């Protein structure tokens, strides 16, 4: 069972991890929320380092860049490829072909710049409030969302791909275990506060369904790039709602 954790850490992070990979890569999906917690914990440490010198802007930059370096930019690359393929390809085949191109186009560049700036602004607000649990929650929920997408949508490429080994055997057991783990970790990180936990969970679900709907419409399934983009967009959505919660917007609406 721990071999699944090894595979999950090697897949989602650049951390040097000893041990053997799982025989079935899909077994690593059970561990995605836990790896999200590891990533979130490291990102939080970087944010705390920036706040330790009283510099929220530095804290947000360290958290953002640290997350990118820790994940080798894997999810960000998926976001760029998704934007290029979905908005640059007029047909399913064209979209899949563009997504496989290692070069980043104009749509991909715009998506990366926009989402990274957006995340930096949210992280700045969260760092100022020292809402470290909410920062980590974004990392946990975004990796949990990847499992849900992999378990409920077919793989789009007939010629295989890097994510096919994870998606082809994914099913309800992976979805249920990851969902329960992700929700429990969310509540723990937010000190069992019901209202903010439900709001962040709502944001992650909306972003997840949006990515799933768009991917189904454009290519009829998912790829590794879609899973990476899902992680980036869910994380951004969670951090946005966390920042809005801290600014009291939901109380103002109520």
Curated annotation (Swiss-Prot):
Gene Ontology, cellular component aspect: plasma membrane
One Pfam short name: CobS
Recorded catalytic activity of this chain's protein: alpha-ribazole + adenosylcob(III)inamide-GDP = adenosylcob(III)alamin + GMP + H(+); alpha-ribazole 5'-phosphate + adenosylcob(III)inamide-GDP = adenosylcob(III)alamin 5'-phosphate + GMP + H(+)
Entry's localization field: Cell inner membrane
Domain of life: Bacteria
EC identifiers of the protein: 2.7.8.26
Pathway assigned in UniProt: Cofactor biosynthesis; adenosylcobalamin biosynthesis; adenosylcobalamin from cob(II)yrinate a,c-diamide: step 7/7
Gene Ontology MF annotations: adenosylcobinamide-GDP ribazoletransferase activity; cobalamin 5'-phosphate synthase activity
Alphabetical GO biological process terms: cobalamin biosynthetic process
Regions that span the bilayer: 27-47, 50-70, 104-124, 131-151, 170-190, 194-214, 233-253
Membrane topology: Multi-pass membrane protein
Needed co-factor(s): Mg(2+)
Keyword terms, alphabetized: Cell inner membrane, Cell membrane, Cobalamin biosynthesis, Magnesium, Membrane, Transferase, Transmembrane, Transmembrane helix
Record function comment: Joins adenosylcobinamide-GDP and alpha-ribazole to generate adenosylcobalamin (Ado-cobalamin). Also synthesizes adenosylcobalamin 5'-phosphate from adenosylcobinamide-GDP and alpha-ribazole 5'-phosphate.
Family, similarity comment: Belongs to the CobS family.
Name of the protein this chain belongs to: Adenosylcobinamide-GDP ribazoletransferase
Organism: Chlorobaculum tepidum (strain ATCC 49652 / DSM 12025 / NBRC 103806 / TLS) (Chlorobium tepidum)
């Amino acid at each position: 069972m721990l071999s699944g954790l090894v595979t999950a850490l090697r897949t989602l992070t650049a951390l040097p991890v000893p041990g053997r990979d799982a025989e079935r890569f899909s077994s690593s999906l059970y561990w995605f929320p836990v790896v999200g917690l590891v990533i979130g914990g490291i990102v939080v440490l970087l944010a705390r380092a920036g706040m330790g010198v009283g510099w929220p802007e530095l804290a947000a930059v360290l958290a953002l860049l640290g997350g990118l370096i820790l994940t080798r930019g894997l999810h960000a690359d998926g976001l760029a490829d998704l934007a290029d393929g979905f908005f640059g390809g007029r047909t399913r085949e064209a979209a899949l072909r563009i997504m496989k191109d290692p070069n980043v186009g104009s749509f991909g560049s715009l998506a990366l710049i926009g989402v990274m700036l957006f995340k930096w602004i949210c992280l700045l607000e969260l760092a100022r409030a020292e809402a470290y649990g909410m920062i980590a929650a974004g990392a946990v929920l975004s990796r949990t969302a990847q499992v849900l997408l992999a378990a409920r949508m077919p793989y789009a490429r007939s010629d295989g791909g890097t994510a096919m080994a994870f998606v082809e055997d994914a099913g309800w057991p992976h979805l249920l275990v990851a969902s329960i783990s992700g929700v429990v970790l969310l509540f723990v990180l937010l000190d069992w506060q019901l209202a903010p936990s439900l709001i962040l969970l709502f944001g992650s679900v909306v972003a997840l369904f949006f990515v799933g709907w768009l991917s189904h419409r454009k290519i009829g399934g998912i790829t590794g790039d879609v899973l990476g983009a899902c992680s980036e967009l869910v994380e951004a959505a969670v951090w946005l709602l966390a920042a809005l919660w801290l600014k009291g917007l939901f109380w103002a609406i109520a």
